[in-house]
Structures are given as C-alpha cells and as structure tokens.
Amino acid sequence: METFLIRLLQFILAISLLVLLHEGGHMFFAKLFGVRVEKFFVFFDVGIGKWKGKLFSWKPKKDDTEYGMGWLPLGGYCKISGMIDESFDTDQMKQEPQPWEFRTKPAWQRLLIMIGGVLVNFVLALFIYSMVMFVWGDSYFKVSDMSMGMRFNAEAKALGFKDHDVMLGTDQGPFREYANVNGDFFRQIAQAKRVDVLRNGKKHSITLPGDMDMLPMIKTRPLFAEPFIPAQVDSVLGDTPAAKAGIKAGDLIKSINGKPVETWTDMNYQTGVLSDVLAVKNTHKDSLAVRSVVLTVQHKGAAKLDTLKLMLTPDLKLGVLQSTLASYYKPVQEEYSFFESFPAGIKHGWNVLRGYVGNFRYLASADGAKSIGGFGAIGSLFPPFWDWYMFWSMTAFLSIMLAFMNILPIPALDGGHVVFLLYEMITRRKPSEKFMVRAEYVGITILILLMIFANLNDILRWLHLM
C-alpha cells in the first residue's frame, strides 16, 4: 500500500505540474494578445449536486481571470473567452463577438495561443533534463565495456548472434548504452543493416535487414538481447528461504528444479513458469508443491555444487538481491558545469522525443495496441520509493509525451485546433462554428474511448489477463 501511495503522489505531482504549466502556456499567449481568460484551475472543478466542485478560488482586482483549485486531480484547464473547447459553451458563441474574445483575433495569434502549451512542455522538458545533467550528471554503462557480452533469445540467435557476443556498434555508429526503458539500443539494432560484435576476441559482422520490428525485441521474454549477468547473489535478506537454506552473498545459482541457470534472466524465467503453474492450482497443498524447489548452488570459493531443497515465498521469491551491472562493470560518469548542462540536456531531450515519435508507429499493430497504458501504467513508471533523480527524469519524459500527444491532429486536442487554423490561414476561409462544435464532440468521443481502452488494458494486465 505504501508503494502505491508513493507512486500515486509522484504521478499526481508530476501531472499537475505539467498540466499547470501547459495551460499556463495557453494563458500567457492569450493575455499577451488581449484575449480574456475566464478561468484557470489546477485540478478539475467537476460539480456534484449543488456543489460546484471548487476547493477554493479567487479573482484578483483588475483581472478577468478566476484562479482556483478543483477536487479531481487529473490535471487542470484554462477557459478562454470565445473559444470552442471541451466546455461547449455554445451560449457565449451565439452572442455578438467581442474584441477580447479568441474568435476575433487574427489566425496567427490564435495559432500561437493554441501551441503555447506544447511549447512550454517541450521547453520545460529540455530545461529539466539540463538541470538533471547539471545536478547528477550522466551515468551509464557503455555497451562495448561489457566484457561478458550479451545473452540473446532464440530470434536473435537465428539472425547470427551468439551468447557472450560483445556489442560494438552498427553501420549507424557505435552503441552508447544499454537501456531497454527508452529502447535506443534496440532501435539502433532494428534500423541496422550491419551489427559489429567482438566474438572470442575477434571482430565479427552480422548482416541484418535494416527494417526490423522493434516491438517484439522489447516485449518478448526473454528479451532480444540483454547484458550477461551471472545468477550470483549480491546479498541475502533476513528470515527468507535463501537465508534458511544457507545461501550467502557471492553464491552462484546453477539450476532450479533441474533446469540450467546461467543468468538472472534464466532464474526469473523459471520462476515465471512456476507462477503460471501456481495460478491454476486450487488447493493449498498443490501451491506448496509448486513452491517447493530444488536449487543447485555453487557457494563462493567452493569447487563442488551443493543441492538445496527450499520453499519459496507465496509470491515465489527466494529472498535475495540479485547482482546487477554495477556488480561487474564501472559506469561511465559524465559531469557538466551549469552552462555545459544545457547543450547536453537539449541533446538528450531531443533524442528522447525522436525515440518516442519513432516508437509511436508501433501502436498501429495489435501488439502495440496492447502496450497502450492508462493512469496505472504511467504511474508505474515512477519508482516505488522517492528519488528526486528518477522523479525529475520521469517528469521530463512525461512533459515530452504530453507535448507530442497534444499536438496530434485530433479535434479537442491542441493539434486539432492547429490543423483548422492552418486550413484557415491557407484558404482564407474560417470553418463554421457549427462545424467546430461537431468536430469538438468527435474529438472528445475519440479521447474518451482511447482513455477507456488504455485504462482497460491496465486492468487486464493487473488481472494477468494480458
């Protein structure tokens, strides 16, 4: 429960900050061009019965804007006079146009008002990434330094890769770091026509088609490629199956129930198989039988193997901390001065945007549609503990995501309004208000259906039905 609350708090804080500044971008340009902003709210003030849904609000003197906070923590909004938006204030649109209204302003001013939020989100992301570079620097594990090489799945081996190949680079350039979170490593392989590896001390080239589908690389388990990390115990937690069986730090797990184990990927895969078996067991006796396993362990400093019988926890945990890349390799640490951090942050932010846009095309496939997530999926991106580096890095990523999603040409989104404004600027013909209202309804319907679909995916994943 504590983990859930920590993630929820991070999610609400990040989304609220991003939406607040996004809407602030709209308001900035609106007020700059003399457009009246009627309301600017953090969280939505959805009314319930006679209650208007406002936690508090105020209206400064000599200001036409009501500022406040609603109760529904899903972002916020600003209501601009004379604009057809999700409020569907058609009564206002029936009245005589006023000089302070959005609809009476030149198309170029309305365009800047509409893209103001996206601009703020993108600039904010670059600024956050720059400050992250300044405060924490950039720490990563260089792929070519991983002397034990990679562990490949069957699909990768069919293309010519072999376990323990050290990945050097592709025809597009050398590999930088391994990170299956943003997919840059896999994207480079998917787009490559040649991958260079170091095999048994000799350079070897593998020919690839150059247009591989990246989605299976990161969705399939085991992954297409991942660093070879031996199944060595980093540390043992107290009063756990491992501690009771005599397993200690430095021990190597060699097999589980007769199945060979070389890496933690192997171990996790086998416990995953047990999890599938456990899911269909109905009795306590049957579940105990599944949890009862036989491990072959090579204790630290010992030549012989030791066979251990133990009972895994109900969630099939051994009770150890696994060795990681940091157990075997020294990360590259790049530090930046205040002024050096800006070009580094901008470069990183641009790469994140380029990768996100590149991955977007996969959503058109069946597997890609299944990967769409709602509030639960976004919240799970945050760590189950409070870490400022992770929080700001994820906030910057969400800011880029919010900017890109909002600029999509869907009515009700900023991008939809931009399309209509560009049409007006090119043809000198303004779409009718009746058409704009209908388009807004269509856009809202699309967004609601997408939100239902995304959150339904979250529920199905939570129920292990996907």
What are these regions (language model features)?
Residues 2, 96-107, 220-244, 249-255, ...:
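Functional transmembrane alpha-helices
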Residues 3-93, 405-427:
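Small-residue-rich helix-interface/hinge motifs
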Residues 10, 76, 80-153, 438-444, ...:
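Internal alpha-helical transmembrane segments
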Residues 15-19, 79, 121, 125, ...:
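Alpha-helical transmembrane segments of multi-pass membrane proteins
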Residues 22-25, 69, 156, 164-167, ...:
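Terminal peptide-recognition signature
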Residues 83-90, 102-105, 148-213, 238, ...:
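Juxtamembrane extramembrane loops of integral membrane proteins
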Residues 114-147, 183-187, 191-235, 294-296, ...:
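PDZ/PDZ-like peptide-tail recognition elements
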Residues 132-176, 217-255, 259-263:
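PDZ/PDZ-like domain segments forming the peptide/carboxylate-binding groove
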